[in-house]
Regions:
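Pre-Walker A-like glycine/lysine-rich segment at the N-terminus of P-loop NTPase domains
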Residues: 1-60
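Coil-to-beta-strand transition motifs
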Residues: 4-6, 17-19, 93-97, 108-113
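Hydrophobic residues positioned within well-ordered beta-strands of beta-sheet architectures
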Residues: 9, 22, 82-86, 98-100, ...
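Short acidic, glycine-rich loop/turn motifs
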Residues: 13-15, 86-94, 118-122
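Generic "edge-of-domain/loop-turn" microfeature
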Residues: 18, 29-31, 91-93, 109, ...
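Short, mixed charged/polar active-site loops
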Residues: 21, 94-99, 128-132
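Conserved P-loop NTP-binding catalytic core
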Residues: 52-109
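Electropositive, glycine-dotted interaction segments
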Residues: 105-221
Length: 221
């Protein structure tokens, strides 16, 4: 998927800063020939900066970066966790509809990624159901579901995933976008590997986020 086109169709924010729940739909078309131009406007306190902050968190997650400690400050007051959900279209030899969502909690003033979920479907196959892979850092027995994944990967790769899980938790990084996870998935979960690699490349090369703390003017491209 070296020449893939990635589009963000919509995103949902829960319990982030002053936004208890918000959803923005960027474009109703799943496939577009031209780039979207998105303008966010509204009165002070309406959540414009929160949207930019949410994209910064997304970028850090998909690039496999360590979440900054101040990420915990984005969790809404009196809430334990925040949740971000992004709906993508990936267009290439295979076209996929993808939803990537994750939840972050505050543990002693450090961000803890308690869950990541990847739901995908090949958009050209209308009769096929969606597939979902869920990672949980707070579950000992069902930390990666469906459990058939472990049987597909075998003992050695499952052990490598457990090591990757511990590293991701210690370093406050995404599990799905850990390089070791991609290596474990690539032979048995080809579509998942392609999707994760495509989203990673999109975050690194096409998703630019400048927060208000970096500039007097906030831009989101």
């Amino acid at each position: 998927m070296n020449n893939s086109k990635v589009r963000i169709n919509s995103f949902e924010l829960l319990n982030i800063k002053n936004v208890n729940y918000g959803k923005i739909t960027v474009n109703s078309k799943r496939i577009a020939n031209n780039s979207d131009i998105l303008g966010i406007y509204g009165q002070n306190g309406s959540g414009k900066t929160t949207v930019v902050d949410a994209f910064k968190i997304l970028k850090d997650m998909m690039e496999g970066n360590q979440l900054p400690q101040e990420t915990v400050n984005y969790i809404s007051a009196n809430e334990d966790t925040m949740k971000l959900c992004f709906d993508f279209s990936i267009n290439d030899n295979k076209n996929f509809d993808v939803v990537y969502e994750f939840s972050i909690a505050n543990n002693n003033n450090f961000p803890v990624i308690i869950e990541e979920k990847l739901t995908y479907k090949e958009s050209s196959l209308s009769g096929h159901s969606k597939k979902t892979i869920t990672y949980s850092s707070v579950s000992e027995d069902n930390w990666l579901t469906p459990k058939i994944i472990a049987r597909q990967l075998g003992v050695d790769k499952t052990t490598d995933l457990i090591v990757a899980k511990k590293i991701s938790e210690k370093e406050h990084k995404s599990f799905f976008f850990n390089e070791e996870v991609a290596m474990c998935f690539k032979d048995n979960l080809e579509d998942v590997t392609d999707i994760l690699c495509t989203l990673h490349n999109f975050a690194c090369t096409d998703l630019f986020v400048i927060q208000s703390s970096d500039s007097n003017i906030t831009w989101l491209n």
